[in-house]
Each structure stands twice: as C-alpha cells, then as structure tokens.
Amino acid sequence: ATAYNRGQILYRIAEMLEGRADQFESEIALTSQITSAKAKALVSEAIDRWVWYAGWSDKLQAVSGATNPVSGPFFNFSISEPQGVVAIASSDSFLEFIDAIAAAVVSGNTSVVLVPGSLAVPSMSFAEVLATSDLPAGVINILTGSLDELAPWAASHMDIDGFDISGIAKKKQGALKEAGAENLKRIHSFGSGKTPARILAFMESKTVWHSVGV
C-alpha cells in the first residue's frame, strides 16, 4: 500500500473505534477499575491518537529522508523504510497499547502485539475493529497471555526485526535485550505520549547513489 493508503486505513480504524466507543468505555472501566468518565476520556484520546498517527503516514519521508551533500557528479539520497516485523510488549494501559501499535504500522511495518491478561477483553474487541477497517490480514497480530512467557520468545525469534518493550518492567528489559542481540534486533522502550520518534525508531535508512544527468 502507498503511504497515502496507509493513512486512510489508520483513519478508518479511528472511525470504527469511535463507532464502538460505548463498548470500549464499559470494558475499560470494568477491566481497569476506573470511573466511566475516565474511561470515556481515555477512549476519546485513543481515537485522537489514531488520527494523529494517520497524519504522519505520507509525511515521514519529508521528515526523515534527506539529500546528502557529496563532492562528485552524483546524487546521494537517504530514504527511510519500514524495518519489517515489530513485536510489541504492551502495558495494561489501553492508550499505550494504541500508541505502540499505531507507531509501528504507520510506516509500513507488520506487528505482533503481546497483551497482558488484564487488557485481554479490550484488545480482543479492538481486533474486531481491525477486521472491519480495511486493514490487510496479518498486519496487526494480537496475542494475549503472560508477558513473562511471551516476551522472551519474541526477543529471541530470528524473524522478528524490532521489539517495543515499553510494557516490560525495567528490571526485566536487560535479559530481553541480550536475547535479541543475536540477530541484531532493534529493541526500544518508550514513555507514554505521542511522538514521531517512536515511529522512526522502527524504520531504517537506505542510501541511494545516482549519477547526475543520467
């Protein structure tokens, strides 16, 4: 899909999530033990996050790409590309769950999302949203269970290129980084909040040389 089409799909996810806002509010209030008012504000912010990330889809090259200065009769360009398959260890916050997924897929990555049991119900409802949002099959894959069991598997998996371990306690992150070192897996942890740095963390730069006048 083109960058523009990815943005359209992410925006469609926001629309479908908004259409089921009442369901998510009740599920989050129940599973997270928060008030209905707080759950409503959280779902509203989650919808806004999808729209925010959707807007980045066709602007990433303008921000991260470059024409590099060279001393010769040729051009040199740096172009950002998606890394590939990104695993995500989600925290039990629905908003952080959304942030991690949107940041990974907006650039064109596919994702394997590891979700703790405390967020299982909202995450499975969100999988239903994805199924009706024109998202190609296999782009976002959600697994629920114990992160203590799932995260080491993801860290050592040779076909996973990046790993967002924001949902893992800091004292356990070192072991995951060691496990991911064998295939040079790019492993990052982020704080809460939206930032383009989270998108760029799972992109790679390709440098292209081209002769002038050819």
For the regions a protein language model found, what residue spans apply to each?
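N-terminal Rossmann-like NAD(P)+-binding subdomain of aldehyde/semialdehyde dehydrogenases
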Residues: 1-75, 103, 116-117
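Residue-level signal for inorganic ion chemistry
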Residues: 6, 108, 140, 154
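Short acidic active-site motifs
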Residues: 38, 149-150
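Hydrophobic/aromatic ligand-binding patch that stacks against planar heteroaromatic rings
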Residues: 103-105, 153, 179
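Short hydrophobic alpha-helical runs that function as membrane-insertion/retention elements
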Residues: 111-114, 141-143, 162-164
